[in-house]
Amino acid sequence: MSQPQTVTVDQQEILNRADEVEAPMATPPTDVPQAPSGLTAANNAAEQLAVSADNVRLYLQAGERERQRLATSLRNAAAAYGEVEDESATALDNDGNGEVDAQSAGGAGAGQTESLEETPKVAAAGESDFTDLKTAATKLESGDQGTSMVNFADGWNNFNLSLQRDIKRFRIFENWEGDAATACEASMDQQKEWILHMAKLSASLAKQANFMAQLQLWARRGHPTLADIVELERLAKDPDYQEQAIKLYAEYQETSEKVLSEYNTKADLEPVNPPKPPAAIKIDPPPPAQPQGLIPGFLMPPGDGSTGLASGMTPPMIPPTGGAGGTPDVNTAELTSAGREAASNLSKGLGVKPMSLGGGGGGLGGMPMGDAALAGGESVRPAAAGDIAGAGQGGGAAGRGMAGGGMGMPMGGAGQGQGGAKSKGAQQDEEALYTEDREWTEAVIGNRRRQDNK
């Protein structure tokens, strides 16, 4: 059998940490890189960088949703340890009927990352095996020559540093220990590792962009310039330099093909594929607390003047005070009815009042009976089967009732020869001589519906 676990909890620390975890992180760059030149390979590289950046931003949004779920779980964990102090005060100010709202900012648990896909690969394509020297130089010298690539790289490098500064929110708790704290810290650690990985991928995007800018610079330095080619074409028209110009043009063409071939190969960038964010730990909100007033409801009388007792419930019975110890446990209804029957068999001169025999208790006093009781009208009811348990038992019960009531009348043996031969069916046909219907006997016979006075 597992032993109870002692935990340390600082609820406010958990709530503050939830706010930290949910706080927005740095915004990733949104600029789209431009091709550094007019070469096909350069355009493909720029498109690949844009596609990779779009997918990284999409994954970062999914990670933000997981952090929100993690924050929700932290708030639910804090709520499970009890209400916040000021919210509890609000509940008391509302006469005990205030409620502490459970945090529920969306479903916590498994993240909805099914729609995330790998970054597609842009079709690798470059210049044809043979490209006219002048055309190649014209394309190579067009474009911004890598300026937007450098800006793109700077943006993602800065974002990388920002992400690394944001992981402080995933530190361990100082004043929360226990299994729940360990599980939440493990989930936060997963989020931290994922953020660090996304920071590395951000640096990878920046590295690819910087590489393209450097590749463009290298190609410009190694490829014959458009101005040199134009000058060579002019010299080729001069008979004195024609042969030398044709030979130099062939060398330029060979150099151009080598530069373009290497450019096409190196500009074939790999897509940046981020991993899916880890699913945040799922902690369901605690069940809503039942509103409880400062005074228990069963002690508060309803406003309509009724007794406030639920259907089927009876008030607590007052225990008998005059019965002798060791008296058999006789049903109260049987005891009371038997006493009434015994009273009916007594002579008028004895002065015994039915009230003194009610339930074997220590007598309820000589309160005057109401008109309805004396008239024997609606207050008289047919006797139940359990009300008349036989003359012998009735006599004995009545004797105990009067003895308990202080009457002291000897009733022993009254059951012999006094109605003991009556059949059970005949007893059931009889009617009770008297049924008490006053507030003074409620504690003995229970609450009954008040009858209209006639």
From Swiss-Prot:
Domain notes from UniProt: The C-terminus is necessary for the co-dependent secretion, for maintaining the EsxA (ESAT-6) cellular levels, and for interacting with EsxA.
Post-translational modification: Cleaved at close to the C-terminus during secretion.
Gene name for this UniProt entry: espB
Record's subcellular location: Secreted
Name assigned to this protein: ESX-1 secretion-associated protein EspB
Organism: Mycobacterium marinum (strain ATCC BAA-535 / M)
This protein's GO CC annotations: extracellular region
UniProt keyword terms in alphabetical order: Secreted
Region Disordered, annotated ranges: 17-40, 82-128, 391-454
Phenotype on disruption: Mutant is extremely defective in intracellular growth.
Keyword Secreted: yes
Ranges annotated as biased composition (Gly residues): 391-422
Xref: Pfam families: EspB_PE, EspB_PPE
Further information: Secretion of EspB, EsxA and EsxB is mutually dependent.
